Regions:
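Helix-loop-helix module between adjacent transmembrane segments
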Residues: 121-123
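Glycine-rich active-site/cofactor-binding loop and its immediate structural neighborhood
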Residues: 308-310
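C-terminal nucleotide
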Residues: 1-33, 39-42, 47, 55-58, ...
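A phosphate-binding catalytic loop at a beta-strand-loop-alpha-helix junction
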Residues: 125, 301-302
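DPxDG-like acidic metal-binding loop motif
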Residues: 125-149, 177
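Residues at or immediately flanking beta-strands
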Residues: 110-112
Length: 355
C-alpha cells in the first residue's frame, strides 16, 4: 500500500496545478442551527408533531477537488487540507466517510480527492455532512449522473450513520446541498424543505460565531438524547416539546425579520436544549454564553449537538464586536472568532483545470 501511494504521488496531479486532466471543484456550505436541532433524528420527530429545524447556511465551508485517475488501481487517494494523504480501499467503507461515500457513488474507485478547505472535527457546524455532500456531488458530476435531492440526503444520512455507528439526522445535509436559510418540517410523509425569504445579509449582520476550542462528539451526545426520549424520560420529552415550539417561533420571526423575536426563539431553544443531557452544556460553554449575553447578545447557544465546538450568538449589529470580545475573554485558550458569510445557494460544480 505504501508503495502504491508513492507511485500515485509521483504521477497524480499536484496541489498547484492539474496538467492534462479535468479537476472538478465543489463547495458545500456549513450551517448554524438556530432552533429545532436534534428533532431531525428519526424517529424523534415522529414523537413530536409539528417538529421542524431552522438553520442558516454559512461559508467558508468545505471545498474539494476531484480528479479521475485510473492509475490508482481502483483505490481512492485522499489528501487532507494539511497535506496528509491516505489510500482507501473498498474495505474501508465501514470506518471512513470518504471511502463510504466515494465507493458508493463511484464503485470502481480511481479518484484523487484533494480537500482544500474543511472545518475541524467537532465544530458543531455540520462539517462531516457538508463534506459528504461535496464528495457525492463531485462523484455524480464526473459520472454524468443525477440523484434527486431527497434521495441523496437519505443515502448520505445512512452512509454517515454506518461510519459513526450512531443515529444521524438530515438537517446538516440540506444547507450543504441547497443553501439557506431553511426551515425543515418533518412529518410521516417525509421532510418539507422551505427556503425562507429572509435576506442573508440581514442574518449575517446579527450572527457572531466563536470556535470554543472545546472538543465534542455529536454522535454520542445525540445518542444520549435519543435513548432518553425512547425510554420515556419526562425531562427529555418536555425539553423536545419546548424545542418544537421555539423552532416554530424562530421560523415565523425570521419571515417577519423580527430581530428580537428570533433572539427570543433561539434563547428558548437553548434553555430547553441544555437540559437534554449533561454533556450538552459543560461549564466552559455556559461561561462563554453568559459572557456574550452580559455584553448585549439577545441569545447564545452551542451549535449542533452542543457540548463544545462552535458557539453562536444572535445579536443587534452594533454589539457584535463587544460580544465577540466578551466571549473570547471567557473562553478557554485557543478559542477564536470564525467568519460568518451567509449563503443563499451553493455554487455550481465547476471544472477548474483541463487539457
Amino acid at each position: 500500500m505504501a508503495e502504491l501511494l508513492q507511485a500515485a504521488k509521483a504521477h497524480a496531479p499536484g496541489r498547484e496545478s492539474d496538467p492534462g486532466r479535468a479537476s472538478i471543484e465543489v463547495v458545500a456550505p456549513l450551517r448554524i442551527d438556530l432552533a429545532g436541532g436534534t428533532l431531525d433524528l428519526w424517529p424523534l420527530w415522529c414523537f413530536h408533531p409539528g417538529a421542524l429545524t431552522v438553520n442558516v447556511a454559512i461559508s467558508p465551508g468545505v471545498r474539494l477537488r476531484l480528479v479521475v485517475d485510473d492509475r490508482l488501481g481502483g483505490l481512492i487517494r485522499h489528501r487532507a487540507p494539511d497535506g496528509r494523504e491516505t489510500l482507501l480501499r473498498p474495505l474501508d467503507r465501514g470506518q471512513n466517510l470518504t471511502a463510504a461515500v466515494g465507493f458508493h457513488f463511484r464503485p470502481e474507485g480511481g479518484v484523487f480527492i484533494d480537500v482544500r478547505d474543511q472545518p475541524t472535527v467537532g465544530s458543531g457546524l455540520g462539517g462531516s455532512s457538508a463534506y459528504a455532500v461535496a464528495l457525492a456531488r463531485a462523484c455524480l458530476f464526473v459520472a454524468g449522473r443525477r440523484v434527486a435531492p431527497t434521495a441523496l440526503v437519505d443515502c448520505l444520512k445512512n452512509l454517515e450513520a454506518g461510519v459513526l455507528i450512531a443515529p444521524t439526522g438530515v438537517q446538516d445535509f440540506w444547507p450543504a446541498l441547497a443553501g439557506g436559510p431553511l426551515a425543515l418540517s418533518f412529518s410521516p410523509g417525509g421532510v418539507r424543505v422551505e427556503r425562507l425569504a429572509t435576506p442573508t445579509a440581514w442574518l449575517a449582520d446579527r450572527l457572531v460565531l466563536i470556535d470554543s476550542g472545546i472538543a465534542h462528539a455529536s454522535g454520542m451526545v445525540n445518542w444520549e438524547v435519543y435513548r432518553a426520549r425512547v425510554e420515556g424520560s419526562r425531562t427529555t420529552t418536555r425539553a423536545l416539546e419546548a424545542i418544537v415550539t421555539a423552532a416554530q417561533r424562530c421560523r415565523d420571526a425570521l419571515l417577519a425579520a423580527d430581530e428580537e423575536g428570533v433572539g427570543e426563539a433561539v434563547a428558548a431553544d437553548w434553555a430547553a436544549r441544555r437540559t437534554l443531557a449533561p454533556a450538552v452544556a459543560p461549564p466552559a460553554v455556559e461561561a462563554m454564553i453568559a459572557a456574550g449575553l452580559q455584553a448585549g447578545a439577545l441569545a447564545g447557544k452551542a451549535c449542533g449537538a452542543g457540548g463544545g465546538g462552535s458557539i453562536a450568538f444572535w445579536t443587534p449589529p452594533l454589539t457584535r464586536a463587544a460580544i465577540t470580545a466578551a466571549a473570547l475573554q471567557a473562553a478557554p485558550a485557543g478559542a477564536r472568532e470564525l467568519p460568518v458569510a451567509t449563503v443563499g445557494r451553493p455554487p455550481a460544480v465547476r471544472i477548474v483545470a483541463s487539457n
